[in-house]
Amino acid sequence: MEKVPMTTAGFESLKEELRWRQQQERPRIIEAISEARAHGDLSENAEYHAAKEAQSHNEGRINELEDYIARAEVIDVSRLSGDKIKFGATIKLLDEDTEEKKVYQIVGDQEADVKIGKISISSPIARALIGKQEGDVIEVNAPGGAHNYEIIKVQYI
């Protein structure tokens, strides 16, 4: 079983989602199925079919979450240090083309959300950053073309 790197916060978030799906969403869906079943003929009962589809989706996600949690290699980022960029690092970058500053944290695939500055360890920008340090310049080939970034700051917070 291949381990999946994950921050402590990401691991806790997955556990919370699993708890919610098992303890709140599952009973709610079961109740919706029961109510829809009470309406009679199931072959043309849209509420019943929608509830069954929601149940299938929920159970699939529960299985997925259980798998990720079982394979998680939880890394406490606050205990990491060093000058070189590795999993968990928070990096401040300067886009050399636009002069725009960006801040990213390198996290596991399941916790990545670029809108809040969390990039996947397997993303092109993270792969380009790993092993680099403050002052280095990286080139990232993105769908919109190549970008050059200067690494301004590396932290483990």
Swiss-Prot record:
Keyword hit for Coiled coil: no
Keywords: DNA-binding, Transcription, Transcription regulation
Pfam families for this protein: GreA_GreB, GreA_GreB_N
Example GO BP: DNA-templated transcription elongation
Family: Belongs to the GreA/GreB family.
PANTHER family with a match to the protein in the record: TRANSCRIPTION ELONGATION FACTOR GREA
Record HAMAP family: GreA_GreB
Biological function: Necessary for efficient RNA polymerase transcription elongation past template-encoded arresting sites. The arresting sites in DNA have the property of trapping a certain fraction of elongating RNA polymerases that pass through, resulting in locked ternary complexes. Cleavage of the nascent transcript by cleavage factors such as GreA or GreB allows the resumption of elongation from the new 3'terminus. GreA releases sequences of 2 to 3 nucleotides.
Annotated protein name in UniProt: Transcription elongation factor GreA
Originating species: Bartonella tribocorum (strain CIP 105476 / IBS 506)
